[in-house]
């Protein structure tokens, strides 16, 4: 469920005043994740790496309350749930968008992920949960390694967005550079940093 709230009644009141009409209110953080454990678990359990990373992203986000509030247009919207978006190549060879509702239960999330990414790939129709859930956008550039990405401010979508390329092997460990973009009205750097730390911790905890 989504509902409009008064910014003055929230901890984001001053940020709303400062950043809602800024020319570029988006901030990008870069972080290199150690994904060694995630790769080992995905291979051992025959699970998709990107599905598991999306699950960890959702799990890391629910621990930061700022993820449940998002500036939409000139309004501040409160959400009860979080979903993770993934980009799917459809049968026409083009890309479609698929939102997956976050569930704390990995098996439930996996089933939803497999069901709806296959459905979107076959139909080419986007699956949009933004009316009810705060969406975390993701994009995996699987054909190449990238160091990061900036300048993803559309002026329309204010959702947090994470992008990554191919992971890299160094010795016996695997690393994945990511870019995390967020709207400064939604959260401050400390909140973004906490999310990224949560993300690394969730990756390490996967079994």
What does each model-identified segment do?
Residues 38-63, 176-195:
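Acyl activation and transfer enzymes in specialized metabolism, enriched
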Residues 67-99, 125-128:
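Small-residue-rich loop/turn and linker elements
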Residues 27-31, 38-44, 95-107, 187:
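Acyl-group handling in specialized metabolite and lipid biosynthesis
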Residues 1-13, 22-24, 36-37, 58, ...:
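Domain-scale detector for complete catalytic domains at protein termini or as standalone homologs
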Residues 147:
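Active-site cores that bind ATP or allylic diphosphates and position pyrophosphate for catalysis
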Residues 90-144:
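Helical lid/core segments from catalytic subdomains that handle acyl or acyl-like groups
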Residues 2-8, 20-52, 70-84, 135-138, ...:
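Gly/Ser/Thr-rich phosphate-binding loops and adjoining beta-strand/alpha-helix segments
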Residues 130-143, 160-197:
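Histidine-centered acyl-transfer/condensation active-site motif
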């Amino acid at each position: 469920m989504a509902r409009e709230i008064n910014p003055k009644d929230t901890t984001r009141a001053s940020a709303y005043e400062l950043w809602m009409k800024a020319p570029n209110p988006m901030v990008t953080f870069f972080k290199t994740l150690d994904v060694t454990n995630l790769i080992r678990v995905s291979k051992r359990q025959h699970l998709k790496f990107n599905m598991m990373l999306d699950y960890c992203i959702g799990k890391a986000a629910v621990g930061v309350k700022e993820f449940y509030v998002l500036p939409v247009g000139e309004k501040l919207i409160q959400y009860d749930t979080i979903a993770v978006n993934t980009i799917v190549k459809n049968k026409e060879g083009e890309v479609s968008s698929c939102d997956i509702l976050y569930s704390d239960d990995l098996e439930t999330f996996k089933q939803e992920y497999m069901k709806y990414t296959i459905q979107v790939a076959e139909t080419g129709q986007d699956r949009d949960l933004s009316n009810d859930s705060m969406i975390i956008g993701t994009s995996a550039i699987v054909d190449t390694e990238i160091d990061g990405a900036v300048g993803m401010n559309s002026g329309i979508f204010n959702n947090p967005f994470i992008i990554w390329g191919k992971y890299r092997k160094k010795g016996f460990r695997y690393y994945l550079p990511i870019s995390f973009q967020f709207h400064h009205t939604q959260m401050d750097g400390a909140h973004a940093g906490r999310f990224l730390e949560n993300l690394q911790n969730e990756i390490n905890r996967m079994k």
